[in-house]
Amino acid sequence: MKFVLLFGVLLVTLFSYSSAEMLDDFDQADEDELLSSIEKEEARAKECTPRFYDCSHDRHSCCRSELFKDVCTCFYPEGGDNEVCTCQQPKHLKYMEKAADKAKKFGGKIKKWFG
């Protein structure tokens, strides 16, 4: 019986050690992947079109706001035949960002009160 107990403890110890090493490998891979995606995002961020600027050359190049990506909106000016495209933020997304900011500030106040 002592042998079975000793063997069980040894088996659990080896299993936990191998699990910890596998998790470390996964964490390292996740960190490498995260760093590469951040570098790609920074490289892509330099090429984006700011809000209210012309985006007719690339309609998917609008910059991101705090939470959402701006949308390339095209329209015909009054009395004009040429289409004009600019990066704009839709109103419903603007209101959602404002609500998220207010909720974040309110959450910070609650954390201060009870923190």
From Swiss-Prot:
It comes from the Eukaryota. Expressed by the venom gland. Transmembrane segments: none annotated. It is found in: Secreted. Pfam families: Toxin_35. The keyword Cytoplasm does not apply. Keywords: Disulfide bond, Knottin, Secreted, Signal, Toxin. GO terms for molecular function: toxin activity. InterPro entries: Spider_toxin_CSTX_knottin, Spider_toxin_CSTX_Knottin_CS. Residues 21-44 form a propeptide. Disulfide bonds join 48-63, 55-72, 62-87, 74-85. One of its GO terms (cellular component) is extracellular region. Residues 1-20 form the signal peptide. The presence of a 'disulfide through disulfide knot' structurally defines this protein as a knottin. Belongs to the neurotoxin 19 (CSTX) family. 01 subfamily. This is U3-lycotoxin-Ls1a. It comes from Lycosa singoriensis (Wolf spider).
